[in-house]
UniProtKB/Swiss-Prot annotation:
Recorded superkingdom: Bacteria
Job of this protein: This is one of the proteins that bind and probably mediate the attachment of the 5S RNA into the large ribosomal subunit, where it forms part of the central protuberance. In the 70S ribosome it contacts protein S13 of the 30S subunit (bridge B1b), connecting the 2 subunits; this bridge is implicated in subunit movement. Contacts the P site tRNA; the 5S rRNA and some of its associated proteins might help stabilize positioning of ribosome-bound tRNAs.
Coiled coil residues, start to end: none
Cellular component terms per the entry's GO annotation: ribonucleoprotein complex; ribosome
Organism field: Mycoplasmoides gallisepticum (strain R(low / passage 15 / clone 2)) (Mycoplasma gallisepticum)
InterPro entries the record matches: Ribosomal_uL5, Ribosomal_uL5_bac-type, Ribosomal_uL5_C, Ribosomal_uL5_CS, Ribosomal_uL5_dom_sf, Ribosomal_uL5_N
Name under which the protein is recorded: Large ribosomal subunit protein uL5
Keywords, in A-Z order: Ribonucleoprotein, Ribosomal protein, RNA-binding, rRNA-binding, tRNA-binding
Self-association and partners: Part of the 50S ribosomal subunit; part of the 5S rRNA/L5/L18/L25 subcomplex. Contacts the 5S rRNA and the P site tRNA. Forms a bridge to the 30S subunit in the 70S ribosome.
Length: 185
């Protein structure tokens, strides 16, 4: 059973019953996943940005958009409009496929992995995690990697209640660290 089917058939009814939602539409759902890779060295060498784009495309299955600096900053030696990274926004089937790959394949390959933080929810209930090495994804061939590079993965969730969102991520199989506060979940 894939993750999307599990969400629709098992997780939605469970959360609806557990939190007393009157409608299925009240149950939190993942709207999109944004993967952002900052390439600070791109200011010196434009080829690094192309390599990062290719890696991000291999990981996500979608062509990344180049992100540019909003303002100049002399301490970072960047000018306004200069390319400094790339990002991908995944929705629909690609989003579910990426999430399944992240949970079942990539995160178990992280060295000394003890679980994801419970404190990574922002004020709007979105969950962000940092991946330190792109090589944990099977699409990246280690011998072709010029530089180990990390990126951020943000799960944008429809609800702004961190308690509901935490429970949703646990049910989806995210390896969140269990604390006393969330011990029953």
């Amino acid at each position: 059973m894939n993750l999307k089917t599990k969400y629709k058939t098992k997780i939605v009814p469970l959360l609806q019953k557990e939190f007393g939602f009157s409608s299925v539409m009240q149950v939190p759902k993942i709207e999109k996943i944004v993967i952002n890779m900052g390439v600070g060295d791109a200011t010196k060498d434009a080829k690094l940005l192309e390599l990062a784009q290719a890696e991000l495309q291999a990981i996500s299955g979608q062509k990344p958009v180049i992100t540019k600096a909003h303002s100049s900053n002399a301490s970072f030696k960047i000018r306004q409009g200069q390319a400094i990274g790339c990002k991908v926004t995944l929705r629909g089937e690609k989003m579910w496929n990426f999430l399944e790959k992240l949970i079942n394949i990539a995160l178990p390959r992280v060295r000394d992995f003890r679980g994801l933080s419970n404190r990574a929810f922002d004020a709007r209930g979105n969950y962000t995690l940092g991946i330190k090495e792109q090589i944990i994804f099977p699409e990246i061939i280690y011998d072709n990697v010029k530089k180990i590079r990390g990126f951020d993965v943000t799960l944008v969730i429809s609800s702004d209640n961190a308690k509901y969102n935490h429970r949703l991520l646990l049910e989806l199989g995210m390896p969140l660290i269990k604390t006393k506060e969330h011990a029953n979940g």
